[in-house]
Structures are given as C-alpha cells and as structure tokens.
Amino acid sequence: MKILWLSNIIFPQLCREIGLNPPVGGGWIQSGAEALIHQKNDLKLGVVSFYKGKELRVFKQFEITYYLVPEHTTRNSVYDNQVELYLKKVNTDFKPDIVHIHGTEYGHSLAQVKACGSHHTIVSIQGLTSFYKNYYLGGISEREVRSKYTLRDIIRRDSLITQQEYMAKRGELEIELLKSVHHIIGRTSWDHSCVWSITPKIKYHFCNETLRNSFYCFKWSYDKCKRHSIFLSQGQYPLKGLHQIIKALPLISRDYPDTEVFVAGNNFFSSIPFYRKNGYANYVHKLMKENNVQHKFHFLGQLSEEKMVEQYLKANVFICPSAIENSPNSVGEAQLLGTPCIASYVGGIMDMVHDNETGLLYRFEEIPLLANHVCRIFSDNILAQKLSVNERKVAALRHNKETNTSRILEIYKEVAAE
C-alpha cells in the first residue's frame, strides 16, 4: 500500500539533509511515520511538506519519499493556487492508494482536494482554526489590545486583531475542506462535536497520537524535581494563556515566594528592540511589572526534544493555561513522563485530564483556582505522586505506539476498500 501524507512541518530527517533547523515539536509526526513503516513492511510512505522555495524538490534516498512543495501565502492571500499544480505532479509521481492530510489549518490541505479530489482521502484534525479564532485574544478585550499597539504592529499591519482576522480567513478554507472530504480522524469529543456541527454526515474515525520517542523513555520523580517550579511549553501569543500565569503568580508567591516559571521559547518582550515588539509583548511586559513578577520568569529559548524532556522532569508542575486546545501534545508529553499537570478546562482537554486523578482542572478565567491548584501540588507531595502515577498509566495507553499504528492501518484499509 502506498500512503501519501501532507504535513504542515518539514520532517527533522529532511531538515538535516537540506541544512535547516528541525521544527520545534515536529518530531511527533516523524515518530508516527516511523512506527507505521516498521509495523507494516509492505507500506510505502511519501510525505509532502511546504516551503518558501521556487521549485518542487523530491528526495527518494530515504525510507520515506519526501516532496517539498513551494507555497507562498500572505495575511491578505491565504491560498496559493500554484500549490494545486505542484500537488498534481506529486500525486502523479507517487500514485498513492491513500492520501492522509495532517491538519486542516492551512490552505495547502484544501489545495490537495481541489487538485486531486477527495477519493481515498483522509483528514486528521490537529487544531481547528475556524473555532480557535474565537479564542485567539485569550480573554483580553479588543480595547486593551488596541491600547497596546506598537510601532511594529502599525508598520507591518500585524496587530493581534489582524492576526485574528488572518486566522478567520484560514478558518474559511478549513470549513470548505471539511465539507469536501468524506473521512476525518479525530481524538476528542470536542473535535468530534466541532466537525459534526460543520458536516454532520462525514465519517469520523477515532485514533490517538503517537508522541516523540524520548517521552517514552523517562519518568518524573518528586525527589529529583526543582521544588516550586512551573514549566510552560509555550506562551508567545495570547491564546496560550501566559498572561493568566502572570496574574496567578502573586497569589502563588504569597505562600511560595521562591516560585519560578520556566517557559520554552524566546523572551519576546524584554530582550528585543522596541521596534520588533508586538502588542502582546507590550501587554505581557506591563502585566509583569504591575504584578512585580518579571524576575520570576525564565525563557529557555527553542528547546530540542531532549531538552524538553529535561524541563518536564525538572518541573514541580506543568501547566497548560490555554484559552482553547484540542488535545495538546504538551499535556500528553507531561502525562507520559508523569509530571504533575494542571490544565484549563477547554476544548478536548476534558478527555485527557480527569480532575484530581490525572491532573487538576480549572476554568480558563478562574485565576484563584489556578493559583490554589499550584499551591496544592507544591504543598502535597502525596497528591503530586498520585497524579504522576495515574497520568503515566493513562498516557501509556493513549499514546501506545503499537495500538495507534494498528488503528491507523485499520482506517487506511477501510477507506481503501471503498
């Protein structure tokens, strides 16, 4: 069987071949591809990724056949018609039995269906842009957003409001895609409900994700963690909820003044020139000063897979404070390692975290409850260890490589038989 994947990221293996830095967090999709190939010896896999180049590039020297397709979009033009022509060439060259589109967020997913039709085509849900757009500002009012406009925002016409509008445009393409295909793969009751609301007759297939390899190899230990430390996997735009942690920190610090927050990603507000600072950076910087907590935050830069594991293991608690998520890999990774988790009760997180059993939940806007949850884990090592043990059990089942690979092969066979 020949399977052609469309991916939003360039696989790390190909990045190394062409001299690019591997994408942060992109290793999970390559891990899934490798598990698929190793479990099914007669399967041939091709992967299409997209880049800002000028020509179609093909790499056939690996176990996976890679295609790099030029794609040029802007905030004003979110769909590149030329991509359809390139994808026709790719499909003619590879001749897939099944096309598996990973993600609905970008125009190239729709381009595949427009170019080659929806027969024997499956779309996997990652995030859902058409719904995420409603939460992009993370509860910050438009008035507050507009008051924090920066020189960069004005010159580049790239404020948080315009970013939200850009997401809405991509959401329109996403809806068109979902209405054009017959098979969807999802993994939460939230994504199931969202897809059902758009196209109720579509065939929904359930399948969990396989995570990056390193996260299966280590185990969090209370005795080895850094006490009163919080880890966040990202925070550079408002949907991810960094500002909620800033608001909670004075309450946490009242009981635990030595609390520190470690954030994967670059410092985007105090270590860059003013002319590169965006509105959210302005908002975050001011909020930190108002709460006198800027000294408690440590931005770690772009972290490799191994460094991410290291930070999860060091943390006393991991928090996912997002305004919306489907099934964030960061929560899955933390649970697989056993790092005690706190997460906002949004989107598909309800299917990943059972309150007081495999993590602690709070409503996104409930800052006192978030702060209290952190203090509970800091003060109660028995609770922390209970959560850790339970998380590892449920995550090991959810992210089991063999189970998930077998399930995806079942779906491929079912679709191919039509």
Feature names for model-found ranges:
Residues 323:
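Aromatic "clamp/platform" in nucleotide-sugar-dependent glycosyltransferases that forms part
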Residues 4, 221-240, 246-251, 261-264:
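Conserved donor-binding/catalytic core segment of Leloir-type glycosyltransferases
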Residues 275-302:
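Nucleotide-activated donor-binding/catalytic signature segment of Leloir-type glycosyltransferases, i.e.
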Residues 91, 302, 310-315:
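Short alpha-helical donor nucleotide-sugar binding micro-motif in glycosyltransferases
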Residues 340-343:
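Short hydrophobic beta-strand element within catalytic cores of glycosyltransferases
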